[in-house]
């Protein structure tokens, strides 16, 4: 099966002031595939994920070197002439803890569209329904769209956050430990959802759960101390890693 690039990290160095966090990362992200970033706490995986949609720009001492190219036009989204807000519309993100806005379910999903200046009500309504359908939440909330989002269960709130990210039709969806605050049943729903979403959107996920990475991902990148140690097909990484450090991590010898 042919693999097409959706994004490519090239020689990415990232620092907070004088502290270097990423040491020249080069990594492909393939279209309509799930790429898992794994590694012990502090290895740089969440830092790398947040580079994709310029979240670090919110901090004054953040410094990027290198490129993140978005295909097919190979534009460098780290370029100084690129608007970070536009990047965040094209590359959505869902965080570790569900963070619905203190608004209605409808307004949460419509938020990105209204920020973008979309005014056509019928289009917004269509996108809200479509995104909630994609997030497997529509049937549970269709009769209470104008109820508060904070009244939803934790698992429903996380699916709402996924719907909110999907509403602007991002090219890539970033998931930062999306199930770590959820119960096992909600976790299973999110994992099943990831498998469905990959048909429509490219996904990169940070997870501390090696079992989850093996279950949901097509490719896995193992990071350690700011370096990318090994990248490959997930079945190869988890059954026949090439680097001893990868094997030590996935067999529980450290981390």
From Swiss-Prot:
Molecular function in Gene Ontology: ATP binding; ATP hydrolysis activity; ATPase-coupled phosphate ion transmembrane transporter activity
Family that this chain belongs to: Belongs to the ABC transporter superfamily. Phosphate importer (TC 3.A.1.7) family.
Cellular compartments per GO CC: plasma membrane
Subcellular localization(s) per the UniProt record: Cell inner membrane
Organism field: Bdellovibrio bacteriovorus (strain ATCC 15356 / DSM 50701 / NCIMB 9529 / HD100)
UniProt KW Translocase keyword: yes
Protein name in UniProt: Phosphate import ATP-binding protein PstB
Chain positions recorded as ATP binding sites: 39-46
Topology with respect to the bilayer: Peripheral membrane protein
PROSITE patterns: ABC_TRANSPORTER_1, ABC_TRANSPORTER_2, PSTB
Enzyme Commission code(s) on record: 7.3.2.1
Keywords, ordered alphabetically: ATP-binding, Cell inner membrane, Cell membrane, Membrane, Nucleotide-binding, Phosphate transport, Translocase, Transport
Top-level taxonomic group: Bacteria
Chief location category: membrane
ABC transporter domain ranges (all copies): 7-250
GO annotation (BP), single: phosphate ion transmembrane transport
InterPro entries named in the record: AAA+_ATPase, ABC_transporter-like_ATP-bd, ABC_transporter-like_CS, P-loop_NTPase, PstB-like
The keyword Translocase appears for this protein: yes
Function: Part of the ABC transporter complex PstSACB involved in phosphate import. Responsible for energy coupling to the transport system.
Catalytic reactions on record: phosphate(out) + ATP + H2O = ADP + 2 phosphate(in) + H(+)
Listed SUPFAM superfamilies: P-loop containing nucleoside triphosphate hydrolases
Top enzyme category: translocase
Assembly, per entry: The complex is composed of two ATP-binding proteins (PstB), two transmembrane proteins (PstC and PstA) and a solute-binding protein (PstS).
